[in-house]
UniProtKB/Swiss-Prot annotation:
The lineage of its organism: Bacteria, Pseudomonadati, Pseudomonadota, Gammaproteobacteria, Pseudomonadales. Its main location: membrane. It is found in: Cell inner membrane. It comes from Pseudomonas putida (Arthrobacter siderocapsulatus). This is Cytochrome bo(3) ubiquinol oxidase subunit 1. Gene3D superfamilies: Cytochrome c oxidase-like, subunit I domain. Binds 1 copper B ion per subunit.
Amino acid sequence: MFGKLSLEAIPYHEPIVMVTLAMIALGGIAVVGAITYFRKWTYLWSEWLTTVDHKKIGVMYIIVAMVMLLRGFADAIMMRTQLAAATGGSEGYLPPEHYDQIFTAHGVIMIIFMAMPFFTGLMNLAVPLQIGARDVAFPFLNSLSFYLLLAGVLLVNISLGVGEFAKTGWVAYPPLAGIQYSPGVGVDYYIWALQLSGLGTTLTGVNFLVTVMKMRAPGMKLMDMPIFTWTCTWANVLIVASFPILTAALALLTVDRYLDFHIFTNELGGNPMMYVNLFWAWGHPEVYILILPAFGVFSEVTSTFAGKRLFGHHSMIYASGAIAVLGFAVWLHHFFTMGAGASVNTFFGLATMLISIPTGVKLFNWLFTIYQGRLRFTAPIMWTLGFMITFSIGGMTGVLLAVPGADFVLHNSLFVIAHFHNVIIGGAVFGYIAGFAYWFPKAFGFTLNEKWGKAAFWFWISGFYVAFMPLYALGFMGMTRRLNHSDNPLWEPYLYVAVVGAVLILFGIACQLIQLYVSVRDRNQNLDVTGDPWGGRTLEWSTSSPPPFYNFAHMPEKVGLDAWHEAKEAGVAYKPAAKYEAIHMPSNTSTGLFMGLFLTVFGFAFIWHIWWLVGASLVATIAVFVRHAARDDQGYMVPAEEVARIEGERMKALAKAGALPAGARVESFERV
């Protein structure tokens, strides 16, 4: 009845795991207790769990990303301390099979369940506002996408206490990932977590491409869109083009494991290298899916805090497109050692080097934007400046690895690990944190504490260099990745230094948590009354903070480049409307939540071969969707009187803050 599932699946013999599970259980009880005590279940259900508001969905994505950052970093610091402890005659404190699960989970979590939802959250929060839209093209699909991601998150975390996770590394290469060498459920957890979350990501890509193409404000040309919107658009093009490849590769691995096919096996006609090609045909575009939106954040931040129009706006768009296109022509550089031959390696090596050209264009455009600007050293701009230095180093090491001869020496060494973290942490993570600080007041109505934000930055950037620069040296010294023990005394000092760096990053994360607490505590002293705390240039800053659920009382018209800045310069930033009209909005729905819940059960049942539950959960998922489709809900109308009331309250607050243009009267904002 329960397939392969039994009480033996719970790792009672692993004290670290059991203590972690106990802490998670206590934390969960505390959260449920707090929600019950403050009687917030109804509010949580109606305002968040069933919402289709892109802004709230964006916030939920970011919350998931931050929770998974803590989980992924816990894995990272365990790996670093294990490697420092397991030298010479010592075996460290993690058994090899546990360590293997940790480094696999770390990679999967940080890329799929931390970085991706962080980017998606910022995109949900800002893009519709930047293009003057009231919501995304398919609001229900947006909700479903989030709950598909959450299904993958749940499966990854369930594997901690029920069964095991994959021991293959985050790439899950066969034949190691095949049923012969990984007969447990770990690889199955990996497959279904990635399949469900990947489906959600694909739907998000389609949703936002349609949103940008069809729902821009009247008069907003494509070339006038903010750079963050453009980089997200290019990222969504990559998502739609690449994620189906991952879906297909994992589906083929699934039939290998479940139905004894021989697609990626070493015998009976199978070819493991086909999986490697398919994986990286998705995997390298995935790197640019992560980094392009961060480039967009840096563009917005640089322009805003330099007080200047972004230098080379059009060239930024073309450079982003070039990066996206070239990103599909470089995947083989991940396995130059495969034996494809000198001609193939040369082509992919040159293509990899070419990507540095449009990336360099971006870097110089940011520098020229800063040049002669009146730079304000807020936390977002500090993350941006830290990125420029750190990412440049990571990019140069990437160009080195693009040389096939050098790659033959450094392949699978810690040099590659250092390079990858150099560009992902120094690029994507720094960018997302900058974007979080930049758009936080827009989402919540008050600014983050600057002192703690800057402290977090200094701990993060110093910790990064202390943690990962030694790994470059260790790579040159011959230390390979995925070791759980070393016996070379020359490596030990570098491993100890790397632990110190990880601890510094831990302090940085602690500062961010303190920053959140202090900011919420002191929110009344840091309110964003105007909706434009930074002196922004794009449309999202024309709305209140947080924006009303309908975003714009009137759709912006004749929107050009830096539309909000131009409106402020012309003195028409808060021009009163002649009258307000009713607004059509989509209704909340619980369908996405229940589909995500049933698909989580579906994945869990497939992992443990509980076939009756597979069928039941699939039928339930289809039934919930059919019920939703049959309802044909057309949404609802927000009365003009309600719109006028909300806008009137905002204008009174603006008048009190002295932000209204000269001669404007509050009464003029309340016409219906």
